């Protein structure tokens, strides 16, 4: 199958319909990265790449303001609080900042401020402060006493880390001075000194534990510990620089003077903060602090500019997720050159082949870097995700002198090649066409930049996740065999492929499951009974359980209904796989598959790729040898009373489970939806029905009880 790079269209060329789809894609990607950064303290992309995603989203929303929704990343901050900590509602939201990446954008920011305030030629004073790369924190004081500390979370709701925060020496338990409000939220950044970070990582390595990636991650991970003693043992620091709720009037009238008040109240305020009276002053500060960045004892990733007068801040207010009176001027990423010694391919849990650069050790921004991401095969060739040349088309080869960048001090990446230092014997890198772990052929779908292993059922790199999928609720759903059991059995080498689940009983004389902690003869007997009960399985569940890319529950049901039986399905798939060529697939079996309503090219190609890998077929044949029966698909009744109708089930159903209700409705030709809209025909409401029932009544959608639904479908 021929592959091509996914083209990202210019915003100016987007239609409204395409813009809506692109906004959805960007929102999902940004949400995933927000969760990694704010909840997991493990960012997956550089600041520069993340900022690029947000800028594209904001450009599209600027062109199509009618597409902006309350759920857009431009309207919210961070990620929802992680499980495990109590939730805290911020009295005043902890918003994020807009970004500037050039001197011109800083000048434009000040121009906007002047226009909004109608200042004419007057230049507003600006407070410039280093942007600390740490974890934002809000501290609530009542009658001067610290009563609660919370992380930013999603900006509205954070995590309660009060007990941990009380161990930080930089945070006063009682405010000092005589102008203390009845209640206030004081804010700042938890961080770790570079020297303390290096010492902590040395201890981690000596203890055989994984080192932290950077000071920001170590600070966030140290603060968000369940064991307060661990937090207390970590050298965490805190700079105060802002406030949220403040009962009564603030004791000062400017940002700069309020920082002085915070200092007198007992907080540490960054001594580098400077009051600027022009754009030039602000940019001089930016360049000076940038030059001193490496020598600073803590990590920073830019400079924050804030309008000094608080009454002007109040007038300027907010625009979406960010204040109009402040902006972050980001630094360019730190870089260094070194030798690319090797390119290795890592295979992820979903089969994605990711190239990793193994480098001669080099210090970038104070951190020794030996590995860096190469993203994908197009990136190595010098082609961007939009199909346009990268690095003026320069490819990356083993032996090259390469430029390494730590953008935002997160994941190092190879950003360019020094061509005049390229060895004479360096050859273009050939990306593997087979999985380096299992040997299955690796394919790249049209429009994608990632090449994936097709050995879904047999690849060790994917095994655990595939097996978890195999036993999931919509697949084989084996009672007593969940994710933890799969991890345990796989770790011990007992279950490597799906068929191994069904041979556990015959192998148990050797395995002795009953001797495992938490198991006994009764629990093992029950597990084997549950496995035996699944030796008879519905065709759509089996298809879903195979873990074929793009084949979710809905597509599995479409395939099952079309082919009817396992024999017909397998025969068609083998015929379609046999007709596959580099130029495409013109076999009758493939055309039949491609023409199934709701399937289409992408799904059809993914299914054929799965069956083109002979070892997948062998693994499936072995599994079928252990099953008693694969039940034929129930045929949909096109003439039922609910055929073609959209139905939503809500509340607690007493006469059938939600899955049974859904299956019955689909057999009768109905579409089961998860939410109520104007297109919904029926809402079947059980006990304790909530918001869906309310919305149905508001929209005038027909609401049925269980008995009324049964009467309708039984006709």
Swiss-Prot record:
Pfam families linked: BRCT, DNA_ligase_aden, DNA_ligase_OB, DNA_ligase_ZBD, HHH_2
Annotated function: DNA ligase that catalyzes the formation of phosphodiester linkages between 5'-phosphoryl and 3'-hydroxyl groups in double-stranded DNA using NAD as a coenzyme and as the energy source for the reaction. It is essential for DNA replication and repair of damaged DNA.
Sites where the protein binds Zn(2+): 435, 438, 453, 459
GO molecular function, one term: metal ion binding
Species of origin: Rhodopseudomonas palustris (strain BisA53)
Key words of the record: DNA damage, DNA repair, DNA replication, Ligase, Magnesium, Manganese, Metal-binding, NAD, Zinc
Any one GO cellular component localisation term in the record: cytosol
Name of the protein: DNA ligase
InterPro entries: BRCT_dom (IPR001357), BRCT_dom_sf (IPR036420), DisA/LigA_HHH (IPR041663), DNA_ligase (IPR001679), DNA_ligase_AS (IPR018239), DNA_ligase_CS (IPR033136), DNAligase_adenylation (IPR013839), DNAligase_N (IPR013840)
Gene3D superfamilies named in the record: 5' to 3' exonuclease, C-terminal subdomain, 6.20.10.30, BRCT domain, DNA ligase/mRNA capping enzyme, Helix hairpin bin, Nucleic acid-binding proteins
Documented EC number(s): 6.5.1.2
Family designation: Belongs to the NAD-dependent DNA ligase family. LigA subfamily.
